[in-house]
Regions:
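Basic/polar N-terminal segments that are highly enriched at the extreme N-terminus
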Residues: 1-4
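Glycine-rich phosphate/diphosphate-binding loop of Rossmann-like nucleotide-binding domains
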Residues: 6-38, 44-45
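N-terminal small/polar loop signature for handling phosphorylated ligands or for N-terminal nucleophile
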Residues: 29-89
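Short beta->alpha linker loops
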Residues: 47-50, 100, 119
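Glycine/small-residue-rich loop that forms an oxyanion/phosphate-binding "nest" at active or ligand-binding sites
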Residues: 85-108, 113-117
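Short, glycine-/small-residue-rich phosphate/pyrophosphate-handling segment
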Residues: 112-128
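Single conserved hydrophobic/aromatic residue that forms the stacking wall/gate
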Residues: 127, 132-136
Length: 136
C-alpha cells in the first residue's frame, strides 16, 4: 500500500454478465459517491471476468496500491459466482460454510426453497463478520 495522508480505495467489479453487457453495473456510482462523502478517494474502478486467477491477481495488485478494495458481483447462487472463494485464495484464508450465515439463510427461505445453490451463499472465507443491520 502506498503511503498517503489521504485514504483511497479501488472498486473491483466482477462478472462476465457486466463485461458482456447483459447486466448493467449499478453499484459503482452509489459506492463511489458514498466513499467520497466520507473522505475516501476512489482511485480506480476495474471490471474483470469470473476467472479465479484474474480475480486473485487483480485483488492482490489493487490491495497493494490502495487502503481499501471493494468488490461487487460474483456472490450469488450460480456456478460462476466465485468471488468469495477467490478472495479467500488471495488472502490465504480457509473457505468453508459459515454456520451463522447458513442458519440465517435457512430461516429466511421457505421449506424446500433453501436449495444447494442458495446454501452456497453461506460458504465464505474465515474471519467473516456478518452485518448487524436488518437491511442486509
Amino acid at each position: 500500500m502506498k503511503k498517503s495522508t489521504k485514504v483511497n480505495a479501488a472498486i473491483l467489479i466482477i462478472g462476465n454478465e457486466i463485461l458482456s453487457g447483459r447486466t448493467q453495473d449499478t453499484n459503482t456510482s452509489t459506492l463511489a459517491t458514498w466513499l467520497n462523502s466520507i473522505g475516501v478517494i476512489v482511485k480506480e474502478v476495474r471490471v474483470i471476468p469470473d476467472i479465479e486467477k484474474t480475480i486473485v491477481d487483480t485483488l492482490n495488485i489493487l490491495r497493494k496500491e490502495n487502503n481499501y478494495v471493494f468488490t461487487t458481483g460474483g456472490i450469488g447462487p450460480t456456478h460462476d459466482d466465485i468471488t468469495a472463494q477467490s478472495v479467500s485464495k488471495a488472502f490465504g484464508l480457509k473457505y468453508e460454510t459459515h454456520k451463522e450465515a447458513f442458519k440465517i439463510l435457512e430461516a429466511y427461505y421457505k421449506p424446500g426453497e433453501f436449495n444447494e445453490g442458495r446454501q452456497k451463499m453461506a460458504v465464505s472465507y474465515t474471519h467473516l463478520t456478518l452485518p448487524t443491520t436488518p437491511y442486509v
